[in-house]
């Protein structure tokens, strides 16, 4: 049951002018059509939303239509313009939006009593389509200018609606003399419109005001005459025929029935073709899903192989590291035992010297000197042992930190890979669910209830998988932050190692990336000039090219595509003007030194264009890893330890 919505006090207190009635009526019609104002209480009961205080609260459809039309077309001053406009909007809403449903709700016994004019008429008779009626003998008056005037078609239309003919429009016909006294009554294009038109024709015929009555020459005619437009009206050489030919065609009921049957058959054929196309599309989607599943299985197998290989390499590195640490610990224990043995020997010797009896001064002096030397050696050995123990603890701590960092990095890699596998699996499930969803959507268009139910289940699963994917993304971000902190710690260790190894002359050391080598420039100057001022000239040229290297606007590189690969790399542009002049002037030595420095700067510090330091494996001529640097540090520590032991 719908509830009546009452207009606000602002709407009741304020009124509108007659020029604003159409705009206000359109607004009220949209409110009615949008459901803001309820009109229907039940299939056969209606209510006026603008008259809530009326004694009669429930109307039949025709009664409400008559009430709304009477108020809307009232000439009484008691009715405000707003009331008239709102009731006219109600008339429009009843006619255009509730007419069909109201006629369907009419009792079947009443419809049968009225009969069906379509069944009783000649189906081969040509009628004007869209269905139209003709009204003649409409009263007119003569104006001062001699032109005729008559009432508008809306009043006549409302009258016909109240009589149950339900026209969509009544259009008076005008010519140069004004109102012609005739009008065209337009009905809906469907079978209901034909039904109303035939009722219109039958009503006037029964009343003695049909077409035959109008054509009889039996004296003056009183009242309106009407009939449905037929072929003779359509072909007539008058204002009615001209208007009918402009707005309609001649068709029989049989032709329209056949045309409707053809359209229905064409619709069925199109639907069948659409079903076949949907089945074909569904088959293609299933085949595509099968191909993608096979490709995904291959990728998963490949990933599993790579993962196993990665695990084996990590285990091998860990075993080598543990073996190296164990070796350091064993050497440390060996040195401790050696120092302990030496200390005991010195104590025994001191005890022996103390027990000797020295009778002469020379022997006592010698004994005193020996005792002092032994005490000095013992003190030095104790200090060395303390230093050794301190160094051992630092090395052990460094090795333990390296082992712990590697284990943490290994665990993070395993977690990330496990998370990546889980994320890929969920993404695969999401893609498969989306593929199934596309298939089900095509199947759901055929109206299968089971398919619709399966689509709902897939929607629910898809939402759960997307929620799991969001949780994994959140966890992934947490792991990325932890990995960044670990990388920062490794970078700090790398910097500390660089500071320690700056002055070392070993295979693993520190190299200044982007620094020009002096020797090629000196050699080139010696070949080009005499021995005088060679070094000064070389320094000047060297400083000039160091300035060029720092210039960020100078970028003598070009991008080339690698063979059998899709990526591009930057290489030296040998067509650069400065480099060509350098090679032509000083030869290959300085040219190679400059290009090498350019490549190093472009690789290690392209934005800053200044010299940076890196751990370098001079033997292999490549960047050294942190593990190589730590290994070299431990080797140097062992050498220093052995030297101290030998001393």
Curated annotation (Swiss-Prot):
Chain intervals with Acidic residues compositional bias: 9-20
Gene: IDN2
The protein, known as: Protein INVOLVED IN DE NOVO 2
Keywords: Coiled coil, RNA-binding, RNA-mediated gene silencing
Effect the entry attributes to changing residue 165 to A: Loss of RNA binding
Assembly notes: Interacts with FMD1/IDNL1. Forms a complex with FMD1/IDNL1 and FMD2/INDL2. Can form homodimers. Interacts with MORC6.
Coiled-coil segments on the chain, per record: 253-508
Function field: Forms a complex with FDM1/IDNL1 and FDM2/IDNL2 that is required for RNA-directed DNA methylation (RdDM) and that functions at a downstream step of the RdDM pathway and downstream of small interfering RNA (siRNA) formation. Required for de novo DNA methylation, siRNA accumulation and siRNA-mediated maintenance methylation. Required for several post-transcriptional gene silencing pathways. Binds double-stranded RNAs (dsRNAs) with 5'-overhangs through its XS domain.
Effect of residue 116 to A: Loss of RNA binding
């Amino acid at each position: 049951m719908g509830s009546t919505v009452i207009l606000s006090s602002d709407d009741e207190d304020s009124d509108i002018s007659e020029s604003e009635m159409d705009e206000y009526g359109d607004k009220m019609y949209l409110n009615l059509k949008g459901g803001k104002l309820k009109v229907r209480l039940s299939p056969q009961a209606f209510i006026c939303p603008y008259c809530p205080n009326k004694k009669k609260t429930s109307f039949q459809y025709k009664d409400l239509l008559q009430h709304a039309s009477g108020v809307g077309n009232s000439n009484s001053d008691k009715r405000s313009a707003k009331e008239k406009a709102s009731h006219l909007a109600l008339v429009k809403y009843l006619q255009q939006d509730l007419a069909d449903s109201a006629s369907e709700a009419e009792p079947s016994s009443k419809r049968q009593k009225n009969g069906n004019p379509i069944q009783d008429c000649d189906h081969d008779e040509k009628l004007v389509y869209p269905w139209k009626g003709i009204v003649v003998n409409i009263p007119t008056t003569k104006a001062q200018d001699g032109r005729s005037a008559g009432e508008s078609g809306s009043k006549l239309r409302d009258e016909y609606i109240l009589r149950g003919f339900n026209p969509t429009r009544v259009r008076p016909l005008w010519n140069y003399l004004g109102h012609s006294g005739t009008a065209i009554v337009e009905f809906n294009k469907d079978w209901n419109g034909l039904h109303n038109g035939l009722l219109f024709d039958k009503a006037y015929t029964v009343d003695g005001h049909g077409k035959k009555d109008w054509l009889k020459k039996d004296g003056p005619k009183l009242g309106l005459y009407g009939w449905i437009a037929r072929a003779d009206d359509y072909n007539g050489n008058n204002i009615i025929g001209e208007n009918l030919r402009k707005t309609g065609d001649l068709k029989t009921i049989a032709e329209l029935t056949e045309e409707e049957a053809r359209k229905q058959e064409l619709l069925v054929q199109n639907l069948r073709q659409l079903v076949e196309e949907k089945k074909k599309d569904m088959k293609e989607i299933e085949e595509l899903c099968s191909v993608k599943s096979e490709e995904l299985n291959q990728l998963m197998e490949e990933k599993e192989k790579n993962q196993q290989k990665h695990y084996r390499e990590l285990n091998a590195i860990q075993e080598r590291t543990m073996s190296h640490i164990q070796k350091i610990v064993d050497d440390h224990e060996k040195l401790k035992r050696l120092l302990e043995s030496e200390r005991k020997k010195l104590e025994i010797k001191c005890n022996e010297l103390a027990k000797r009896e020295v009778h002469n001064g020379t022997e006592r002096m010698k004994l005193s000197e020996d005792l002092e030397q032994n005490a000095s050696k013992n003190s030095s050995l104790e200090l060395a042992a303390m230093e050794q123990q301190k160094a051992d603890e630092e090395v052990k701590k460094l090795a333990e930190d390296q082992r712990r960092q590697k284990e943490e990095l290994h665990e993070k890699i395993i977690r990330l890979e496990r998370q990546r596998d889980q994320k890929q699996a969920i993404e695969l499930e999401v893609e498969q669910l989306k593929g199934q969803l596309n298939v089900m959507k095509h199947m759901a268009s055929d109206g299968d209830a089971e398919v619709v139910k399966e689509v709902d289940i897939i929607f629910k699963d898809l939402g759960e998988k997307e929620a799991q994917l969001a949780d994994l993304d959140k966890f992934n971000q947490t792991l990325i932050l932890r990995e960044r902190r670990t990388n920062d710690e490794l970078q700090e260790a790398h910097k500390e190692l660089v500071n320690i190894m700056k002055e070392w002359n070993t295979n693993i050391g520190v190299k200044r990336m982007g620094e020009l080598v002096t020797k090629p420039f000196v050699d080139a100057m010696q070949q080009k000039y005499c021995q005088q001022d060679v070094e000064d000239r070389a320094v000047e040229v060297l400083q000039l090219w160091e300035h060029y290297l720092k210039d960020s606007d100078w970028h003598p590189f070009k991008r080339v595509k690698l063979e059998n690969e899709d990526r591009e790399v930057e290489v030296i542009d040998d067509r650069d003007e400065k480099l060509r002049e350098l090679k032509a002037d000083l030869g290959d030595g300085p040219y190679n030194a400059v290009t090498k420095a350019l490549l190093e700067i472009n690789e290690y510090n392209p934005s800053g264009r200044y010299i940076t330091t890196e751990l370098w494996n001079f033997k292999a001529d490549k960047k050294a890893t942190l593990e190589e640097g730590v290994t070299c540090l431990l080797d140097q520590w062992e050498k220093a330890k052995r030297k101290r032991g030998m001393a």
